[in-house]
From Swiss-Prot:
Cited Pfam families: tRNA-synt_His
Keywords (A to Z) from UniProt: Amino-acid biosynthesis, Cytoplasm, Histidine biosynthesis
Keyword Signal tagged: no
Claim: Hydrolase is one of the keywords in the record: no
GO biological process: L-histidine biosynthetic process
SUPFAM superfamilies: Class II aaRS ABD-related (SSF52954), Class II aaRS and biotin synthetases (SSF55681)
GO cellular component: cytoplasm
Record protein name field: ATP phosphoribosyltransferase regulatory subunit
Amino acid sequence: MTNPAPIEAPLPKGVTDFLPEKADKIGYIEGKIRRVFELWGFRRIITPLLEFQDVMAAGLGEDLKERTFRFDDRQTGKLLAIPSDITPQVARIVATRMRGCPLPHRLYYIGRVLRHVELQSGRSRETFQAGVELIGLDSPEADAEMVAMAVEILKGLGFEEFKVDLGHTGFIRGVMAASGLGGDARRRLQEAVGKKDSSAVRAILETEPVADRIKEELAALPRLFGGREVLAEAARVATSDSSRRALDNIAQVLDILDIHGVSDHLTLDLGEIRGLDYHSGLTFEGFVTGIGEAVCSGGRYDNLTQRYGYPAPATGFAFNILALLNALEKRPDVEASKTRDLLIFNLKDDRREALEIAQHLRALGYSTARDIIHRDFNDSLDYARRMNILRMMVIGGDYCAADEAYVVRVADKRGTAVKKADLMRNDFSLNTLP
């Protein structure tokens, strides 16, 4: 009997299926992140997959508003939205459901969002996010905590070559306000600064009525990138009080991060313009060597919950799980695949003993599968290897005595006999086997 030909079942562009091996790696990454979030005292929150469009849009920046998927609700006729970011959902929940709870709120989430993208770019419409929101604290220590957590997670995932770039929207806003530029000139200037294009910045300033002192400050922006010494150069050219306050804030955060012991992984980028319509203070992005996109990003957003009627200072950040997956897959020395403990290979006609042993081992916490398909020893061993199972247990046959089971280490086919009575003890451990 031949198998029927598979039907065509294409997916829309920008989404993908994750088969067990990659799904295991995603689960591994999420587990590592979740563990750190909880060690720092954050509690999980789960947000819905649908929001009313007007409610969702209240918490989004202009870019994400344009990239949100929208459609009509057949029940109400209102416009619904699939969330393009989880942070506004958390802000809404805190403002409407948790305003009577004591501050600060330490909340974390793990979920997926959907965004319109240019499909020619090959980018994914789906983003897997894992993030935290610290709501109710306006202090350098709160900002530093976000950065320190991000560094701890990246280290915990086995990365050594990575940097976290710090910026500050207050500094950029102060500089831009001092220029007196508006409209298209300001937009072009911000774009040139964001690209670190010094020649474009100078060309724009040559055609605009900006004071020489301010021109010096603006021309310096693309160069304000590096270590802590950047603060001194920025202070030398800063002309506005708001920019100077931002520099003081960054210095305070850096002092606390030095106590956390993460300074070696930090750089300053005071020409960073990301999030000017959303963030209200310190911002940061994390980059792993060899990966072009940021693996995490975040910052302060003191005005977000106010959009839902509840003014509260807040900061947070999120990891892009698929970017982390991409980075891990470039590191063969980092083991991110999930292993299973045991495959039971039963050669007896009676399945009762095999089922009882499997049930007992699961109760002890060992992942245990039964090879129900009838095949020979080598085929079952090959199946275990391909399924990333560490050991195979043979029950029955001539591999050992009748009161024993034969446990084979899949990696090297090394086997050992184990008394079945020992297997059924409550203190039995697979780790004691060779």
